[in-house]
C-alpha cells in the first residue's frame, strides 16, 4: 500500500484547517493508511494564485483537490473556503471525498 501525500493549504486566521486535519487523520486511521500530511501556510493573495488556492482549508491528496471538479476551477482566493454540504455549507470538505481520495491514492 502506498503512502499518500496530503497537503492542507490554509492561512492564519481561518479556523477550519485544524478540523480538516483531524478529519484526514480520522479517516486515515479508519482506512489503515499512513499519509504524509503537510500543512502549507498561504501567506498572501499572490501565493494564493501561485498555489491555485481555493480558500482555507484546501485539502489535496497527491496533488488533487478532494472536492470533485475543484481542479478545473480558477477562482483562486485568499479567504476561508466554503464547501457544499448535505445541509447547506461547511468549512471543511465532505468526509466521503476525503475517504475516496485517500483510498484511491493508497491503492
Which residues does each PLM region occupy?
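Local sequence-structure signature of Cys/Sec-based thiol-disulfide redox active-site neighborhoods
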Residues: 1-31
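Acidic pyrophosphate-coordinating catalytic loop
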Residues: 46-52
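Structural micro-motif
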Residues: 52-60, 72-77
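Short, well-ordered secondary-structure micro-motifs within conserved domains or adaptor modules
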Residues: 38-41, 57-61
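Thiol-based oxidoreductase modules, predominantly thioredoxin-like and allied folds used
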Residues: 34-46
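Non-catalytic, surface beta->alpha helical segment in thiol-disulfide oxidoreductase systems
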Residues: 64-106
Amino acid at each position: 500500500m502506498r503512502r499518500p501525500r496530503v497537503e492542507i493549504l490554509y492561512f492564519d486566521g481561518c479556523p477550519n484547517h485544524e478540523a480538516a486535519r483531524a478529519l484526514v487523520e480520522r479517516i486515515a486511521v479508519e482506512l489503515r493508511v499512513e499519509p504524509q500530511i503537510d500543512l502549507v501556510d498561504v501567506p498572501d493573495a499572490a501565493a494564493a494564485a501561485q498555489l491555485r488556492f481555493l480558500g482555507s482549508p484546501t485539502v489535496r491528496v497527491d496533488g488533487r483537490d478532494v472536492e470533485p471538479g475543484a481542479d478545473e476551477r480558477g477562482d483562486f482566493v485568499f479567504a476561508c473556503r466554503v464547501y457544499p454540504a448535505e445541509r447547506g455549507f461547511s468549512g471543511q470538505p465532505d468526509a466521503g471525498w476525503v475517504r475516496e481520495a485517500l483510498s484511491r491514492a493508497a491503492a
